[in-house]
Amino acid sequence: MRDTMNLIPMVVEQSARGERSFDIFSRLLRERIIFLNGQVDDNSAALVCAQMLHLEAENPKKEIAFYINSPGGVVSSGFAIYDTMQFIKCPVATLCLGTAASMGSFLLMAGERGMRVALPNASIILHQPLGGFQGQASDIERHAQNVMRHKRRMIRLYAEHCGRAEEDVERTLDRDFFMTAEDAREWGLVDHVYRRRAGDLPLIAPSS
């Protein structure tokens, strides 16, 4: 069976200079829309960060729409995307469609305040960083200490972006915590739940 992710549609546009074709994601990038679809790893993080930096270079004041459908993945890769979102001058709006789990939910909440959106049937899952290690006891201990540092950092940032006490966040992350879109809005992870495209919603407004 062919991998459907390799079957990327092409968009053909007519202009005074003739015909140009783009893959669908490149065309959406022209509208300042970035997709994270699948695992958060070094490759996907590099693509997302590069696209954000490119759009900032084009227009540092215009927002970026970041669509997320991800089960999570590598913590360090997720932090690379998070840091880029905070570093660039463009406001980054986030939208969850499908699932935002683990690092996916972390990136969803990292969007510009007031511009974090979930679609009504989205699923959001929070949990603490995971780690599985092998080797000498001293190496395992060091890895465990590193995971705990990641956990403390994530707790602090969830609390900061969601307006919750760190103790509350720590209890929530202790086990897999499943949220509906409305649950996520009440918890402070997103600001809005939209069923239909809103004409005044910057996240999905076409570029002019």
Swiss-Prot record:
Protein encoded by which gene: clpP2
Principal subcellular localization: cytoplasm
An individual GO BP term: protein quality control for misfolded or incompletely synthesized proteins
Job of this protein: Cleaves peptides in various proteins in a process that requires ATP hydrolysis. Has a chymotrypsin-like activity. Plays a major role in the degradation of misfolded proteins.
Catalyzed reactions per annotation: Hydrolysis of proteins to small peptides in the presence of ATP and magnesium. alpha-casein is the usual test substrate. In the absence of ATP, only oligopeptides shorter than five residues are hydrolyzed (such as succinyl-Leu-Tyr-|-NHMec, and Leu-Tyr-Leu-|-Tyr-Trp, in which cleavage of the -Tyr-|-Leu- and -Tyr-|-Trp bonds also occurs)
EC number assigned by the record: 3.4.21.92
Localization annotation: Cytoplasm
Annotated keywords: Cytoplasm, Hydrolase, Protease, Serine protease
SUPFAM superfamilies hit by this protein: ClpP/crotonase
Protein name listed in UniProt: ATP-dependent Clp protease proteolytic subunit 2
Transmembrane feature ranges: none
Native source organism of the sequence: Chelativorans sp. (strain BNC1)
